[in-house]
């Protein structure tokens, strides 16, 4: 009965929401940025902000935390709205949703309202121009927090009106510390290999790490969560398998490498883009011992990265996964003869 209750708890709760930071000091791995944001909260004097950085590093959590701390738990929802620009990329999101919220007065004596626009780099150039005009018009009673993956995709007139903060990819230590807290709270047992796999899969993305942990916990409810469980539930190849695939091809054993590739594609169900991404990670992170053992030069590594990039581009353009990946392995096998 207890096991069933715990299993039901895992199913019902969404951990990325349950464990989302609600205060700035709970945001992991962005200490310098968070300290600067705290100064705005302390004075309740907030400029327009632009948060730039990869997914899952605390941009949204920071925006919500700012609203909670400035307005308080009773009023923050009335004075804060969150919109996702990737849902509506055009000018209508500015003309309708943003303007309708911005033109109303703050509630409960709040000094201003906050509009959080996530994935702002998805907005078209016309929509960004309209947003810039809206920011100017309603600056007396509204503050904008824009979030994006690439600040270069935000037009200069908007960037110049914002204080820009760059959120970096989270360290392995920051991710592990948070996962250990969640595991303790949920009563989970995770092997050291399980933590290593979660960190590998996450690639600095806390959201992905927590989602991966919950998916694994749903499967292994009665035992320790292992490395194998993480890779299986996230459709990720074991890095050692990818490393062996590359070494086999580079040693000229093309047919053996192709057989392993087919296993990853058809038995493990991995996508071609995921495999290429993992191949790139192994090649770009090769240690000196592996390079010497395979007899590779710096020029060889450059050539391998170049052909990996070409393969990745072709896959995104819709080319056959099997043909492109086999061609990639063939290039690896032939590289030793050139």
UniProtKB/Swiss-Prot annotation:
CDD domains: AAA (cd00009), HLD_clamp_RFC (cd18140)
InterPro entries with a match to the protein in the record: AAA+_ATPase, ATPase_AAA_core, DNA_pol3_clamp-load_cplx_C, DNA_Rep/Repair_Clamp_Loader, P-loop_NTPase, Rep_factor-C_ssu_arc, Rep_factorC_C, RFC_lid
One of the GO biological process terms: DNA repair
Keywords: ATP-binding, DNA replication, Nucleotide-binding
Disulfide bonds: none
SUPFAM superfamilies per UniProt: P-loop containing nucleoside triphosphate hydrolases, post-AAA+ oligomerization domain-like
Pfam entry (one): AAA
Binding residue positions for ATP: 53-60
GO-annotated molecular function: ATP binding; ATP hydrolysis activity; DNA binding; DNA clamp loader activity
Family the entry assigns: Belongs to the activator 1 small subunits family. RfcS subfamily.
Reported function: Part of the RFC clamp loader complex which loads the PCNA sliding clamp onto DNA.
NCBIfam families assigned: PRK00440.1
Stated name of the protein: Replication factor C small subunit
Organism, as annotated: Methanosarcina acetivorans (strain ATCC 35395 / DSM 2834 / JCM 12185 / C2A)
Taxonomic path: Archaea, Methanobacteriati, Methanobacteriota, Stenosarchaea group, Methanomicrobia
